[in-house]
UniProtKB/Swiss-Prot annotation:
Gene3D superfamilies tied to this protein: Spore Coat Polysaccharide Biosynthesis Protein SpsA, Chain A
Cofactor binding note: Binds 2 Mn(2+) ions per subunit. The xylosyltransferase part binds one Mn(2+) and the beta-1,3-glucuronyltransferase part binds one Mn(2+).
Entry GO MF terms: glucuronosyltransferase activity; hexosyltransferase activity; manganese ion binding; xylosyltransferase activity
Compositionally biased intervals (Low complexity): 82-97
Protein name: Xylosyl- and glucuronyltransferase LARGE1
Reaction equation(s) it catalyzes: 3-O-[beta-D-GlcA-(1->3)-beta-D-Xyl-(1->4)-Rib-ol-P-Rib-ol-P-3-beta-D-GalNAc-(1->3)-beta-D-GlcNAc-(1->4)-(O-6-P-alpha-D-Man)]-Thr-[protein] + UDP-alpha-D-xylose = 3-O-[alpha-D-Xyl-(1->3)-beta-D-GlcA-(1->4)-beta-D-Xyl-(1->4)-Rib-ol-P-Rib-ol-P-3-beta-D-GalNAc-(1->3)-beta-D-GlcNAc-(1->4)-(O-6-P-alpha-D-Man)]-Thr-[protein] + UDP + H(+); 3-O-{(1->[3)-alpha-D-Xyl-(1->3)-beta-D-GlcA-(1->](n)-4)-beta-D-Xyl-(1->4)-Rib-ol-P-Rib-ol-P-3-beta-D-GalNAc-(1->3)-beta-D-GlcNAc-(1->4)-O-6-P-alpha-D-Man}-L-Thr-[protein] + UDP-alpha-D-glucuronate = 3-O-{beta-D-GlcA-(1->[3)-alpha-D-Xyl-(1->3)-beta-D-GlcA-(1->](n)-4)-beta-D-Xyl-(1->4)-Rib-ol-P-Rib-ol-P-3-beta-D-GalNAc-(1->3)-beta-D-GlcNAc-(1->4)-O-6-P-alpha-D-Man}-L-Thr-[protein] + UDP + H(+); 3-O-{beta-D-GlcA-(1->[3)-alpha-D-Xyl-(1->3)-beta-D-GlcA-(1->](n)-4)-beta-D-Xyl-(1->4)-Rib-ol-P-Rib-ol-P-3-beta-D-GalNAc-(1->3)-beta-D-GlcNAc-(1->4)-O-6-P-alpha-D-Man}-L-Thr-[protein] + UDP-alpha-D-xylose = 3-O-{(1->[3)-alpha-D-Xyl-(1->3)-beta-D-GlcA-(1->](n+1)-4)-beta-D-Xyl-(1->4)-Rib-ol-P-Rib-ol-P-3-beta-D-GalNAc-(1->3)-beta-D-GlcNAc-(1->4)-O-6-P-alpha-D-Man}-L-Thr-[protein] + UDP + H(+)
Gene Ontology CC entries for this record: Golgi apparatus; Golgi membrane
Residues binding Mn(2+) 2: D564, D566
Keyword Repeat attributed: no
Segments crossing the lipid bilayer: 11-31
């Protein structure tokens, strides 16, 4: 009996071995993601298994696999009979993969860690679909911008947002009068589709926050985010608020969708402050405003405006500010201090954003803990007065990312979106209609098209501050230039002490080169009465007359001296022209005061300080009358022989191809935009002045000297390209016909004179 029991035990043990050993082996081999060397099917090592015959081994394996399959089927039937109890699995694979068979793998471990990261950031969800922004949903962005420097910063911010965006955008910009003028012109000429801009007067909001003492470098404008609920339209429900020193590295729609994650009474979306400022341990006796933990940074804010209004936000922040100012006396970080004080008292208001939505780069931040990889970056915040000079071990990477958008061609952002309906832009519609009417087979098509090209324009690129004199005699020098003429700026500033309006034709990258050049020049930085207006490059021609019109459009004095960048005016010309205004009764007559033009072929010239010195150099061959050897007709009517001995102003008559440099009233006609590049651009303007019955009066003691330079690209094309010259002639004839239609019978003389010549 004992022997029988032992025999049965051996039989059972053998049976179990035959069933479970192959089963475990099969499960091990069928693991999807762990690839290791397969175990032998018998306890023998590979050398001993080689002794077994191949046929017997194959048959044995087949039997074992069949047994394993039958065992698995039995298990499935048993499981199907067991009732399921719904539970919330904490395992990330449960929510991610539903009912899929999931094997343990290294991928699963990664998913688990990612889920933990998401939960820590407040972004975890169990089988809940992630919200998305609708294709054509408009994203609203609010920015406070004041002054010339902030206006430049806004452009870089907007570029980074436009580069990544896939949705229509609506910018709400709170500006002072300076920034409004700059940004209104910029957005108007930028013509980016599916972008709407509203401006709000910061001056009207000053009384709301001026009672708060503020030590922050942003000044009173740094407090205006507090009053957005009152400033922005009452029907606007939510908005993303951004500082001007922000750079986006992702689609802003990803941030917009976070609004869906707000719960309960959460109305503010903020990233935790990444410095120890609010911990009060940066230096001895440092006493910051109250904050929740490390506090929150207000460079990026998600505002639920409708809920804030219901919570009486205005009253809430005012009471908090008044209470804290009794002991703190002033804010150190502007609106951020007050936001944090409110949150300290009402922590339920805040929804904490993951820190990659506001990677703060200042000397005391620990922002490197927010990211391990480039893909982790969403928003970079240069929240230090040092900006790009801030200390950070990864600052070179961040700086390069910032410079990418700083120098990025903004014209490329004019791309159309994917069929989203938008309000009709009449300017864009009219432009497209005009361009469609042009004949693309016309040999002069590119010339004609250039006349209607809308160039992106950034007026007052640098700080400008000047009030015209009260006697109504003030004069602004007007000129235009490209990058290769920058070296003339300092010399002109030394010769002309009055206001200057300059239009610069530059690419985005060249504009930054110019900025660095100007900021490094003591001469240019000492002058606040020079307005620099950037017209961004587009097309193949130099839009010389557009540039002149842009510079003329920013003149705020009664008179303007229409010059060119290659000319140095005589010392004292500014005061001489102002005196001539009174002497010649310019305020009551239509006169164009002619300043005689000369030239030198020497790069180093002892500039004449008087008319006598100039005449001496003229006699010695150091100076010449301008273009005497290539274009005599251009300045011949000035009558240089008479000028040599003249002591009083004298009148001259218009002649064909006359193109003097003149001082006129600010209301004088603009230059005709059809003329681009080289040829007939000034001639046409002088012709129109004559048609409007301006008198040309030569000033006896005024002069200007043209300095030598390499030939421009456009004059080279004019000289070498026959089609260029043919198109210029065609445009000239069309201009003359247009003059006849506008000014009647008297204007026929321009066509007659030209035909005779």
């Amino acid at each position: 009996m004992l022997g029988m029991c032992r025999g049965r035990r051996k039989f059972v043990a053998a049976s179990l071995a035959l069933i479970f050993i192959p089963a475990l082996t099969w499960l091990y081999l069928s693991s999807a993601n762990i690839t290791v060397k397969p175990l032998p099917l018998s306890p023998l090592d590979p050398q001993s298994s080689a002794v077994v015959g191949a046929a017997a081994e194959h048959q044995s394996l087949e039997l074992r696999l069949r047994d394993v399959e039958e065992h698995n089927n039995a298990l499935r039937r048993e499981i199907s009979r067991t009732p399921r109890v719904p539970t919330h699995s904490s395992h990330p694979s449960s929510s991610r993969h539903g009912n899929q068979l999931h094997t343990h793998s290294t991928e699963e471990g990664t998913g688990d860690s990612e889920a933990k990261k998401g939960a820590a950031a407040g972004n975890s969800s169990d089988c809940v679909p992630q919200p998305v922004v609708k294709k054509c949903e408009t994203i609203h962005i609010a920015i406070v911008c004041a002054g010339y420097n902030a206006s430049r910063d806004v452009v870089t911010l907007v570029k980074s947002v436009l580069f990544h965006r896939r949705n229509p955008l609506h910018f709400h910009i709170i500006t002072d009068s300076i920034a409004r003028k700059i940004l209104a012109d910029l957005f108007h000429t930028w013509m980016v589709p599916a972008v709407h801009v509203n401006f709000y007067d910061a001056d009207e909001l000053k009384s709301e926050v001026s009672w708060i003492p503020n030590k922050h470098y942003s000044g009173i404008h740094g407090l205006m985010k507090l009053v957005l609920t009152k400033t922005l339209p009452s029907d606007l429900e939510k908005v993303i608020v951004l500082d001007t020193d922000i750079t986006f590295a992702t689609d802003i729609a990803e941030l917009w969708v976070v609004f869906h994650k707000f719960k309960g009474q959460q109305v503010l979306g903020l990233v935790e402050n990444q410095s120890d400022w609010y911990l009060g341990n940066l230096w001895k006796n440092h006493r910051p405003w109250p904050a929740l933990g490390r506090g929150f940074n207000t460079g990026v804010i998600l505002l639920l405006l409708d809920r804030l209004r219901k919570l009486k936000w205005e009253q809430m922040w005012r009471l908090t500010a008044e209470r804290e100012l009794m002991s703190m006396l002033s804010t150190s970080l502007a609106d951020q201090d007050i936001f944090n004080a409110v949150i300290k008292q009402n922590p339920f208001l805040v929804h904490q954003l993951p820190c990659y939505w506001n990677v703060q780069l200042s000397d005391h931040t620990r922002s490197e803990k927010c990211y391990k990889d480039v893909s982790d970056l969403k928003v970079i915040h240069w929240n230090s007065p040092k900006k790009l000079r801030v200390k950070n071990k990864h600052v070179e990477f961040f700086r390069n990312l910032y410079l990418t958008f700083l120098e990025y061609d903004g014209n490329l952002l004019r791309r159309e979106l994917f069929g989203c309906p938008s309000e009709t832009d009449h300017n864009s519609e009219n432009l497209q209609k005009t361009l469609s009417e042009l004949d693309e087979d016309d040999p002069c098509y590119e010339f004609r098209r250039e006349r209607f090209t809308v160039h992106r324009t950034h007026v007052y690129f640098l700080h400008y501050e000047y009030e015209p004199t009260v006697d109504n005699t003030d004069v602004t020098l007007v000129a235009q230039l490209s990058m290769d003429r920058l070296q003339m700026l300092e010399a002109i500033c030394k010769h002309w002490e009055g206001p200057i309006s300059l239009a610069l034709y530059l690419s985005d990258a060249e504009a930054q080169q110019f900025l660095r050049y100007a900021q490094g020049s003591e001469v240019l930085m000492s002058r606040s009465n020079v307005g620099y207006h950037i017209v961004y490059k587009e097309g193949q021609f130099y839009p010389v007359n557009l540039l002149r019109n842009v510079a003329m459009g920013q003149v705020n004095t009664p008179y303007m001296f229409l010059s060119d960048i290659d000319f140095l005016p005589m010392y004292g010309l500014y005061e001489y022209l102002r005196k001539s205004v009174v002497q010649l009764d310019m305020g009551n007559t239509k006169k164009a005061l002619v300043v005689p033009a000369f030239e030198t072929l020497r790069y180093r010239l002892s500039f004449p300080k008087s008319k006598a010195e100039l005449l001496s150099q003229l006699d010695m061959g150091t100076l010449f009358t301008f273009r005497y050897h290539v274009w005599t007709k251009g300045h011949a009517p000035t009558d240089f022989a008479k000028w040599r001995t003249a002591t009083t102003p004298y009148r001259v008559q218009w002649e064909a191809d006359f193109e003097p440099y003149v001082m006129v009233r600010r209301e004088s006609p603009e230059y005709d935009r059809r003329f681009v590049g080289f040829g007939w651009n000034k001639v046409a303007h002088i012709m129109e002045l004559d048609a409007q019955e301006y008198e040309f009066v030569v000033l006896p003691n005024a002069y200007m000297i043209h300095m030598p330079h390499a030939p421009s690209f456009d004059i080279t094309k004019f000289r070498s390209n026959k089609q260029y010259r043919a198109c210029l002639k065609t445009l000239k004839e069309e201009f003359q016909q247009n003059m006849s239609r506008r000014y009647g019978f008297a204007a026929l003389k321009y066509m007659t004179v030209d035909n005779n010549s």
